[in-house]
Amino acid sequence: MPASSKRLKYSAISQNRKLAYSETDRAYIGLEDIESWTGRLLPGERAEPEGTVSIYEVGDVLFGKLRPYLAKVHLAEEAGACSTEALVLRPQRSLHPAYLKYVLLDPKRIDEINASTFGAQMPRASWDFIGNCKIFVPELTTQKAIAAFLDRETARIDKLIAKKERQVELLHKRAKQAVAELVTGATVGGMATVETGLDHIPRIPAHWSLLRAGHLFHEVAEPNTDDLPVLSVSIHTGISDRQLDDEERDRKVNLIEDRSSYKCVRPGYLAYNMMRAWQGAVGVSTVDGAVSPAYVVAKPTRDLHSLYYQFLLRTPPFIEQMRQGSKGITDFRLRLYWEQFRLIMLPVPPLEEQRRIAAEAERELAHADEVAARIVRSVALL
């Protein structure tokens, strides 16, 4: 039979078999379990749904009709149950299932279907529209050859992507290790060191000293004024020097009109999230701004380079110190109060050395980010 364009509904049938999940012993797949654009199932435990599910068989193709721009398409290799937000498409004998999967994953097809959605908050596509989309249907042997070729290419690209992702991971790991060695004095070659008696930093250069955090910083709680921007904070990068945009602010501060309970931070001030300090949520501000009441804000009490202490406190040994000082029954309830933070013993290099170390740490991380960005761009070209 020569190749032709056909409406999808003439080559695949939308199945409508639904059951209460309690009435089936089939494994369940939600849209959240399908990786966008690849059709792969994501690893990890899957939630068990309440209510009704759709039933599918081996060879059926699942298509996520909710937010179709996410391109959630999966070719079933075993029978199961899925979210009713997925269309269950059963190819006719003239349409190869793997070929149909790739047809539906075509970016132009996804754009076409996405343009048809209805509903502002929960945009959905309908089978009425999707079924009327025209698809190119070559001979079955050609379909199989196309699908096999795309399977091979996808596998090859997946291997390349995995290799590059490992490179990025290793790059960041090495950069963080280099920073940890810098801030703890492990890279000071040819100089005498002394034992500290502390597990988290056993030795330091002999010309460094040790002081508790409370001797280097003191807690401040300057009330926020309305004109100060709300700053973004990350467990990965510390305090950002940019103001949250309207969308981020609405999401992160929950539309609080009166932010008088927010705390001022000034350039050089240290701030940490009481509930996430054990994850490394600590940073130094470079601008005037405001942070959530969930943050402890501390001002230097002596002439020191605060950025050095940001890098220091974000290393694994000092994150562990903050975790040990936190109070709470479980991890998600842990809180690090100033009374415990102030007791942490911190190394104190000479001021100029603090500045030099912080500058080197910034260069290490910036170089890693630059190389990682090049790798990510190369992945996008695959």
Region spans (language model):
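Short, ligand-facing micro-motifs at secondary-structure edges
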Residues: 25-43, 61-83, 87, 98-102, ...
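Hydrophobic stripe of amphipathic alpha-helices that form coiled-coil interfaces
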Residues: 164-167, 171-174, 178, 185, ...
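Sequence-specific dsDNA recognition surfaces
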Residues: 9-19, 23-58, 197, 211-267
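Short, conserved charged micro-motifs
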Residues: 94-100, 303-309
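A short glycine-rich beta-alpha junction/loop motif
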Residues: 66, 80-87, 118-144, 275, ...
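A structural connector/turn signal
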Residues: 50-51, 76, 120, 132, ...
